[in-house]
């Protein structure tokens, strides 16, 4: 009986491969690699919380939060990390609000960044789909879902009702995109805003625009919030930011991390390293002082962060020791640094 089942299945597999091509169906054990390849986010703490060393390749990722919370900054860091690993990226600026000077300060290679400011939601998503199907991109960012205005709404009169148009547009686009992303190994990052539902008595009134499709299709959803200001004396130099991973299909969800976003600089690698280093016992904190072994690296968090920025050899030594404490070998370390090959 078992032999008959095996023969019947082999016949079915052969028929599927003749019709749809070799590799259209296979046993999971036959795949060369089952590890989820990733692109670093620029924050060591967030990479670890995501469980695979960053945002997964070949998947849809949603970053949402209030205004000025760091959504675009996080997306630009992912682009910078993809480029640093030798990859290509695109930024579709539906809001028409990208600051190239800030993007360059974060580390984005503007010379090799593909950039578009589309006229409508349909145009933006068609451009994204064409780029993804080329198979050449590592990451594409759409900023933002709320700004993907359907053509009918643009051409209509102010005040006209267009109920459900954007939700239908997103649903159709994501159905097309999801398969192309998986085949190409491209990560699609959708930035989204927050809206409030009227008349909600219990639970959170907050929701994201664009319908339910993005919530279903996204493998990772990150809620990013500004939770405090970073000061140097009386001057505010950055924001303390919290990210909650509200959905994760590739690792356990609901993890929360905090990191620093410095004005004009982006996510502070050194600040993130301090947090993870203390957590892993590599860096010692006594009162206001931070120390690495016998060496004091600063009094106060900002001074310790500056010390690590000015002494890259000590920063790299601490990073290596943190990886060792976490039990990460060379291959996993490459993934955390955003240099893993995409799984096609």
UniProtKB/Swiss-Prot annotation:
InterPro entries named in the record: AAA+_ATPase, DNA_recomb/repair_RecA, DNA_recomb/repair_RecA_CS, P-loop_NTPase, RecA-like_C, RecA-like_N, RecA_ATP-bd, RecA_C_sf
Regions annotated as coiled coil: none
Entry GO terms, CC: cytosol
Single annotated GO MF: ATP binding
Primary localization class, coarse: cytoplasm
Cell location: Cytoplasm
CDD domains: RecA (cd00983)
Keywords, in A-Z order: ATP-binding, Cytoplasm, DNA damage, DNA recombination, DNA repair, DNA-binding, Nucleotide-binding, SOS response
Domain of life where this protein originates: Bacteria
GO biological process, one term: DNA repair
Residues given in the record as ATP binding sites: 65-72
Family that this chain belongs to: Belongs to the RecA family.
Functional summary from the UniProt entry: Can catalyze the hydrolysis of ATP in the presence of single-stranded DNA, the ATP-dependent uptake of single-stranded DNA by duplex DNA, and the ATP-dependent hybridization of homologous single-stranded DNAs. It interacts with LexA causing its activation and leading to its autocatalytic cleavage.
Protein name stated in the entry: Protein RecA
Lineage of origin: Bacteria, Bacillati, Actinomycetota, Rubrobacteria, Rubrobacterales
Record gene name: recA
């Amino acid at each position: 009986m078992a032999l008959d089942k095996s023969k019947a299945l082999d016949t079915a597999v052969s028929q599927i491969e003749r019709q749809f091509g070799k590799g259209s169906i296979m046993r999971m054990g036959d795949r060369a690699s089952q590890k989820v390849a990733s692109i670093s986010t620029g924050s060591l703490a967030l990479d670890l919380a995501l469980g695979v060393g960053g945002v997964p390749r070949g998947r849809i990722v949603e970053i949402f939060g209030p205004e000025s919370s760091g959504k675009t900054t996080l997306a630009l860091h992912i682009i910078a990390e993809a480029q640093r690993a030798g990859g290509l990226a695109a930024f579709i600026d539906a809001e028409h609000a990208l600051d190239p000077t800030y993007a360059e300060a974060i580390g984005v290679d503007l010379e090799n960044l593909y950039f578009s400011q589309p006229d409508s939601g349909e145009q933006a998503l068609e451009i994204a789909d064409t780029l993804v199907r080329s198979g050449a991109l590592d990451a594409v960012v759409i900023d933002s879902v709320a700004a993907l205005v359907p053509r009918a709404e643009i051409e209509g009169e102010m005040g006209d009702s267009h109920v459900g148009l954007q939700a239908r547009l997103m649903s159709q686009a994501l159905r097309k995109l999801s398969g192309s992303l998986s085949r190409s190994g491209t990560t699609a990052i959708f930035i989204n805003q927050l809206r409030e539902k009227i008349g909600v008595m219990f639970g959170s009134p907050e929701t994201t625009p664009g319908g339910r499709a993005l919530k279903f299709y996204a493998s990772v959803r990150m809620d990013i919030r500004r939770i405090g200001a970073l000061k140097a004396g009386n001057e505010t130099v950055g924001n303390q930011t919290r990210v909650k991973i509200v959905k994760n299909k590739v690792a356990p969800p609901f993890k929360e991390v905090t990191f620093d976003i410095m004005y004009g600089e982006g996510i502070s690698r050194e600040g993130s390293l301090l947090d993870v280093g203390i957590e892993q016992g590599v860096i010692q904190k006594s009162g206001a002082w931070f120390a690495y072994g016998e060496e004091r690296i600063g009094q106060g968090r900002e001074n310790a962060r500056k010390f690590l920025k000015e002494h890259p050899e000590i920063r790299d030594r601490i990073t290596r020791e943190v990886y060792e404490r976490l039990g990460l070998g060379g291959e996993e370390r490459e993934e955390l640094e955003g240099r893993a090959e995409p799984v096609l």
